[in-house]
Amino acid sequence: MPRPSRRGHAQPPKPVIIVPPFFGRRIELPVGWKIGVDIIIFGGYIRSFLQLLLGMIAFGQSGIGPDRHYNGNRFEVLNVKCLESGEYVLQNTKIYSNSLITRDVKDLKPLAGDKIVMNFKTPFTGAYMPLNLQDVIRLVRHRLIFFVNEYGSGEDIPPVDAKGNITIKEMHQHILLRRSIRSDKDFFRGWTGSIFADISKLSERARWLLSCASVVGMGPDSAFGSGFLEISNI
């Protein structure tokens, strides 16, 4: 039986999120191919990092997905780098636990600049597209609230008004065949692409939420690695 949330009635978000690379289609990776995977750990669960790392190594040895029964889909964890410290936590089979540091989202600086581009690394699975800037800020805030309530201090994150223009550079729709036990859905509809935004009129609070978006993403289905993006100035 799922454990209850600390606040509210919805099931709590996962404390560990794996954000895999998204290729937009099913592909077969040749032997020896290397890919990078982002892992985000929230709250006190950072203390379980070594168990998580050993679990990833064990998964690699046994394989993942149906093809593991045929000795397929096996992988090796070559190295792990902490993005906050910039140092390796795992390198050449050696573990450097002191290289692992954390950051509180409260310490993130508001996003600077007047114009930005948002590139979706993984599909955004919200109810509709295109979005306006108010939608973006609202979706980031909602996701952040879930994590702060469950793994943070639970402090209030007030709504923010956002005025600005958004231009869709390119957008691609994807049908993702992934099973959700919570919602009993067989598939998700998602979008990837790039969005230009004029943020010159945004408040400091709204700019801070955009900085948070680079960490926690936006929209629903965070457990599936959905809605993660990169934001850069232009």
Predicted feature locations:
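RNA-interacting cores
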Residues: 1-234
